[in-house]
């Protein structure tokens, strides 16, 4: 004969109170998340909606335009003038971003592999020094970097800009190092016994196994010049608008004398700048997140 235990009244009351508290915390949590999502979405809407507006200036009276048009996008892409030369800016930024993507990715991965897998004198000191340098903002070195580039006649050139981006990328090797730390030592030792050099192990064994961290590094290397304003403004300071990157060009459109004529086109340009980044992230999101988590967990 089986018996079923019946909860006492006190136990039932305690269980009910626990469910109520859990429900209240759940509601509060969702309200906070909804508020954060709203705060995050407002700037996006503030950029997106005016880009479809028929009003050109910044002093519009409605958050949602009365009528929508694609003219701002068509104008900024197909009708460049002395102020808005967006196609040229876009191509300039794309060229710099692609070159930096290739150079920085190779640089970061090689540095990370050397620190993680190679044993040499001063390795620990070099690693600690790089971590210490990372504690200081890069803006502190901008004046020195500018005068070095000026001495080398590399100001107002894309080569100088790419050198700065690529040269500063190596300090971001820590997450990649954390990923390479997870590569089995026995795998590398077996390859060495077969006569493989360190370079061959890196390119033919480690890199094919490291797709998540490779994607993570590529995206970060592309985003740096694509979204940067400060370094680009410092180096490309000749005033020739055809040499500008997207960030400098769009910033120039917000000058007091221009903003009332170009604000809607500025918003359209901002949306167009975000499109390649969004597409790149959506396509590679899985590998990007995996690269961060796997590298950070070990590093």
Task: State the predicted function of each range.
Residues 6-7, 18-21, 25-299:
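A structural signal for multi-pass alpha-helical bundles of membrane permease subunits
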């Amino acid at each position: 004969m089986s018996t079923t235990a019946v909860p006492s009244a006190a136990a039932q009351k305690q269980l009910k109170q626990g469910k109520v508290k859990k429900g209240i915390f759940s509601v509060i949590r969702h309200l906070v998340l909804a508020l954060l999502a709203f705060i995050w979405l407002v700037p996006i809407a503030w950029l997106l909606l005016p880009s479809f507006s028929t009003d050109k200036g910044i002093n519009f009276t409605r958050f949602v335009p009365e009528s929508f048009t694609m003219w701002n996008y068509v104008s900024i892409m197909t009708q460049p003038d002395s102020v808005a030369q967006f196609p040229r800016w876009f191509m300039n930024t794309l060229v710099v971003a692609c070159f930096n993507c290739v150079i920085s990715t190779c640089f970061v991965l090689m540095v990370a592999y050397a620190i993680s897998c190679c044993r040499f004198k001063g390795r620990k000191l070099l690693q600690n020094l790089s971590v210490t340098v990372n504690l200081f903002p890069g803006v502190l070195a901008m004046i020195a970097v500018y005068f070095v580039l000026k001495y080398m006649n590399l100001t107002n050139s894309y080569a100088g800009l790419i050198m700065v981006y690529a040269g500063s990328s190596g300090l971001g090797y820590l997450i990649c190092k954390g990923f390479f730390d997870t590569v089995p030592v026995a795998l590398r030792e077996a390859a060495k016994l077969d006569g493989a050099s360190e370079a061959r192990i890196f390119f033919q064994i480690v890199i094919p196994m490291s797709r998540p961290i490779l994607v993570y590094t590529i995206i970060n290397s592309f985003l740096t010049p694509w979204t940067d304003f400060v370094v680009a403004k410092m180096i490309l300071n000749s005033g020739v608008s055809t040499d500008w990157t997207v960030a400098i060009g769009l910033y120039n459109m917000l000058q007091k004398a221009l903003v009332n004529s170009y604000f809607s086109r500025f918003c359209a340009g901002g949306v167009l700048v975000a499109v390649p980044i969004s597409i790149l992230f959506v396509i590679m999101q899985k590998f990007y997140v995996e690269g961060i988590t796997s590298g950070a967990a070990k590093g």
